[in-house]
């Protein structure tokens, strides 16, 4: 198993820390609802070693600056970042660029079954084509 996202309720920091201690060396324990892209909640998670990665949703916390702060904090903590879409997403491919810019371990945008999702995957392919040989797959610490 490569990843587990939100295995417990959104305030169960102790339970998250327990599973991260048990499985965190070989599995990404991803905090989504636990952190909601909020730096204050992430700081608590870092202190408690609750997870080893975070799901980042650009429009969840409110501003690009706050999102950047969350990504920076995750990097300082040694966490992997997973950039994610939100329900009700548009066909704007910006999160493909964000995921590339921050060397996101993964991008979460769902199956390529609807236009708004396909737009993101197509943009990732365009980015890879444009970068050529400089393109690198971050892939998270477990895939490197």
Regions found by a protein language model. Name each.
Residues 1-144:
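Catalytic core of soluble alpha/beta enzymes
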């Amino acid at each position: 198993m490569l990843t587990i996202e939100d295995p417990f309720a959104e305030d169960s920091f102790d339970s998250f820390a327990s599973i991260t201690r048990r499985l965190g060396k070989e599995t990404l324990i991803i905090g989504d609802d636990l952190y909601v892209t909020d730096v204050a909640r992430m700081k608590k998670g870092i202190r408690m070693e609750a997870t080893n990665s975070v799901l980042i949703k650009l429009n969840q916390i409110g501003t690009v600056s706050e999102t950047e702060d969350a990504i920076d904090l995750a990097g300082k903590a040694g966490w992997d970042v997973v950039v994610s879409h939100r329900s009700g997403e548009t066909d704007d491919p910006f999160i493909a660029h964000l995921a590339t810019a921050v060397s996101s371990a993964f991008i979460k945008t769902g199956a390529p079954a609807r236009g708004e999702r396909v737009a993101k995957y197509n943009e990732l392919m365009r980015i890879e084509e444009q970068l050529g040989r400089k393109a690198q797959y971050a892939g998270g610490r477990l895939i490197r």
